[in-house]
């Protein structure tokens, strides 16, 4: 129950975050729907405050907007999975699910990036063939890393104009 309640809180944060960044979400209605969902899950129970947050701490570790979109795309998917297990005949749950599906569609590229990260973490480098492939790609990977850090440095160095 604690997990679900924290999830509901983070759902509120996600909806507000994307609402502020130009999405077509109706925050007033969503807040009412989230309040009804909190009542469904008895989110005012005292055990909600026990332990660590479910998602908030994870989002804090991602600082750049594009990075946050990757982690938020996964969190939105988790909310959709959670809502599928509830009574979808209730209008507030149906509305939240529709809005989350809209968000997920706008985040589809970010979700693919997340899947790439999962795929990389599951990659087994024990076979000789895959090790050969990895070694042959090493220089290209290092080049990409250098390009990334160089472009960041160029952006952070703003051109100074002469005030003559």
UniProtKB/Swiss-Prot annotation:
Signal peptide: 1-19
Gene Ontology molecular function, alphabetical: cytokine activity; type II interferon receptor binding
A GO term from the CC aspect: extracellular space
Pfam families assigned to the protein according to its UniProt record, in alphabetical order: IFN-gamma
GO biological process: adaptive immune response; defense response to virus; humoral immune response; macrophage activation involved in immune response
Main location per the UniProt record: secreted
Glycosylation sites: 42, 61, 95
Keywords: Antiviral defense, Cytokine, Glycoprotein, Growth regulation, Secreted, Signal
Localization of this protein: Secreted
The family this protein is said to belong to: Belongs to the type II (or gamma) interferon family.
Role according to the record: Produced by lymphocytes activated by specific antigens or mitogens. IFN-gamma, in addition to having antiviral activity, has important immunoregulatory functions. It is a potent activator of macrophages, it has antiproliferative effects on transformed cells and it can potentiate the antiviral and antitumor effects of the type I interferons.
Subunit structure: Homodimer.
Protein name (database record): Interferon gamma
Upper taxonomic lineage: Eukaryota, Metazoa, Chordata, Craniata, Vertebrata
Gene that this polypeptide is encoded by: IFNG
């Amino acid at each position: 129950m604690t997990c679900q309640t924290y999830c509901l809180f983070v759902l509120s944060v996600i909806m507000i975050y994307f609402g502020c960044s130009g999405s077509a979400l109706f925050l007033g209605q969503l807040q009412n729907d989230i309040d009804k969902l909190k009542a469904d899950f008895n989110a005012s129970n005292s055990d909600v405050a026990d332990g660590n947050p479910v998602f908030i701490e994870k989002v804090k570790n991602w600082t750049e907007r594009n990075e946050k979109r990757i982690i938020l795309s996964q969190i939105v998917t988790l909310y959709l999975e959670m809502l599928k297990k509830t009574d979808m005949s209730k209008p507030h749950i149906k509305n939240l699910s529709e809005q989350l599906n809209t968000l997920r569609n706008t985040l589809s590229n970010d979700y693919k990036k997340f899947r790439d990260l999962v795929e990389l973490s599951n990659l087994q480098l024990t076979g000789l063939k895959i090790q050969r492939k990895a070694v042959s790609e090493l220089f290209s990977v290092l080049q990409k890393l250098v390009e990334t850090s160089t472009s960041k440095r160029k952006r952070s160095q703003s051109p100074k104009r002469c005030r003559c």
